[in-house]
Regions:
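Beta-strand-dominated extracellular/periplasmic modules and repeats
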Residues: 1-147
């Protein structure tokens, strides 16, 4: 098992108001860089104790939270967590969160495709120790804006 990460934040509209009831989904590879996907090579080596995905409805204040693993790199990609948000009004956003300052980000084709540094900041997780959680756990807060 990898390092525990507590990922939380809010789903907001373009005016900064919370989006109630948005469906938030995340998925990622395990601590060995293996996805739970039928076409994933090396799938027999996957950590069967790690689900690899989660989904929840954002609360009235737009809040969501997941207990997952700190993402790891795999061939051609820097550490990241995929996410998708669907709102009751039909808005859909699919993107990825990256670890801020990760040296591999500059070699990741998807990350490099985001040329505006201000937009990159919106998807860069700042990881910090998670006080009051399990020993060694990390935490980050990532608000998601859908418009």
């Amino acid at each position: 098992m990898g390092m525990v990460l507590h990922l939380e934040g809010r789903v907001l509209d373009l005016n900064g108001k919370p989006v109630d009831g948005a469906l938030v989904e995340i998925w990622q590879c395990d601590a060995q860089g293996i996805y739970d996907h039928p076409r994933q090579s090396g799938r027999d080596k996957r950590d069967s104790a790690f689900q690899g995905y989660g989904r929840m409805l954002a609360k009235t204040d737009g809040r969501y939270s997941f207990r997952t693993l700190k993402p790891v790199a795999y061939a051609g990609r820097s550490p990241h967590i995929h996410f998708k948000v669907a709102t009751a009004t039909g808005r859909l956003l699919t993107s990825q969160f990256y670890i801020g300052g990760e040296p591999g980000n500059d070699r990741d084709g998807v990350f490099r495709g985001i040329r505006d540094p201000r937009q990159r900041e919106l998807i860069e997780m700042r990881l910090a120790p998670a006080p009051g959680k399990e020993a060694g756990a990390l935490a980050t807060t990532m608000d998601i804006v859908v418009g």
